[in-house]
Amino acid sequence: MNAELIVQLGSLALITVAGPAIIVLLFLKQGNL
């Protein structure tokens, strides 16, 4: 496998996981206020 492909898959997976996580954290912060 190419290193570029691994990097793209890794970044895509990171965005897929981090996206909803950030939204949940922001929602919880607003909820606690």
UniProtKB/Swiss-Prot annotation:
Protein's membrane topology: Single-pass membrane protein
Keyword Acyltransferase carried by entry: no
Gene Ontology, cellular component aspect: chloroplast thylakoid membrane; photosystem II
Record keywords, A-Z: Chloroplast, Membrane, Photosynthesis, Photosystem II, Plastid, Thylakoid, Transmembrane, Transmembrane helix
UniProt superkingdom: Eukaryota
Cell location: Plastid, Chloroplast thylakoid membrane
Biological processes, Gene Ontology terms: photosynthesis
Primary location recorded for the protein, binned into one broad class: plastid
Membrane spanning stretches: 5-25
Subunit organization: PSII is composed of 1 copy each of membrane proteins PsbA, PsbB, PsbC, PsbD, PsbE, PsbF, PsbH, PsbI, PsbJ, PsbK, PsbL, PsbM, PsbT, PsbY, PsbZ, Psb30/Ycf12, peripheral proteins of the oxygen-evolving complex and a large number of cofactors. It forms dimeric complexes.
Annotated family: Belongs to the Psb30/Ycf12 family.
Annotated function: A core subunit of photosystem II (PSII), probably helps stabilize the reaction center.
Protein name, as recorded: Photosystem II reaction center protein Psb30
Organism: Euglena stellata
